[in-house]
C-alpha cells in the first residue's frame, strides 16, 4: 500500500505543507474537499501539481499517473481552484467512482515534525484513527464530518486500503 510505504520511508504520513509539496496551501491533510491532493502528490511524486512526477522522486503508486487514467472514470482528476491569495491553482485530486473527491485526514496520533523545541511534535491530526482517515462520501456525495453516526454517513466508505 502506498501510504504505508511512504510512512516507512519518511517516518510520517504526508500532511501537505512540507517541502517539496507545492499546492499553495490549498490542500492539507484535514479532510476538506481537496485533501486527497496531498495523497496524490506524496504517492505519485508530483510535488508541483504538473501531472508528472518530480525529478528524482520515489513513485509509490504509478497507477495515479494522470496520463494513463481511463477517460470514462478517472481516479485522478485535474481541478482548478483559487489559492489563498486569489491566484488560479491547478491541483490533481483522487476521485471516488461517483466523481467526488476522496477525503484524507491525519490521524489522532500524528504530529508535524518541527525544528524548534517549543513546537516539537505539534499534534496536527484530528482523525478518528491513530494513523490516518481516507474515505469517500459514497454515492450520495454527502457526509457529516463532525458526527460519524449521522444518517448522511451511512453510505460513506471509510479507510480505504486502495492507496
Where are these regions (language model features)?
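N-terminal pilin/flagellin-like segments and related low-complexity appendage regions
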Residues: 1-163
Amino acid at each position: 500500500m502506498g501510504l504505508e510505504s511512504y510512512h516507512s520511508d519518511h517516518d510520517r504520513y504526508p500532511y501537505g505543507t512540507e517541502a517539496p509539496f507545492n499546492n499553495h496551501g490549498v490542500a492539507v491533510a484535514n479532510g476538506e474537499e481537496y485533501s486527497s491532493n496531498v495523497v496524490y502528490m506524496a504517492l505519485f511524486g508530483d510535488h508541483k501539481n504538473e501531472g508528472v512526477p518530480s525529478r528524482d522522486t520515489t513513485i509509490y503508486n504509478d497507477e495515479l499517473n494522470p496520463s494513463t487514467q481511463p477517460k470514462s472514470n478517472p481516479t485522478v482528476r485535474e481541478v482548478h481552484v483559487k489559492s489563498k491569495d486569489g491566484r488560479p491553482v491547478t491541483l490533481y485530486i483522487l476521485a471516488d467512482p461517483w466523481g467526488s473527491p476522496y477525503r484524507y485526514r491525519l490521524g489522532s496520533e500524528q504530529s508535524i515534525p518541527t525544528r524548534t523545541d517549543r513546537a516539537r511534535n505539534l499534534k496536527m491530526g484530528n482523525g478518528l484513527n491513530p494513523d490516518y482517515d481516507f474515505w469517500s462520501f459514497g454515492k450520495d456525495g454527502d457526509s457529516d464530518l463532525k458526527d460519524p453516526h449521522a444518517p448522511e454517513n451511512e453510505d460513506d466508505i471509510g479507510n480505504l486500503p486502495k492507496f
